[in-house]
């Protein structure tokens, strides 16, 4: 069964749009992950420095 050109075009547009949206969402989550990891790193550094400060006294 052959699809009309407009139908195929519409499908292609929809698929591109959904792919773009999912890729954007993925990018957002990745960005958030990076922020979280940086924050975690900073917290760990603070914790470690506190430990060493206590032990050095």
From Swiss-Prot:
- Please note every region of biased composition (Basic and acidic residues): 1-10
Taxonomically, the superkingdom here is Bacteria
The record's InterPro entries line, in alphabetical order, gives: YciY
Region (Disordered): which ranges? 1-25
Instruction: Report the sequence similarity comment from the record.
Output: Belongs to the YciY family.
Q: Which NCBIfam families match?
A: yciY_fam
What name appears for this protein in its UniProt entry?
Answer: Uncharacterized protein YciY
Give the organism, scientific name. Escherichia coli O1:K1 / APEC
């Amino acid at each position: 069964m052959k699809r009309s050109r407009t139908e195929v075009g519409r499908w292609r547009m929809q698929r591109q749009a959904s792919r773009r949206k999912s890729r954007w969402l993925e990018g957002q989550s990745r960005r958030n992950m990076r922020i979280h990891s940086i924050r975690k790193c900073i917290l760990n550094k603070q914790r470690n420095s506190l430990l060493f400060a206590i032990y050095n006294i």
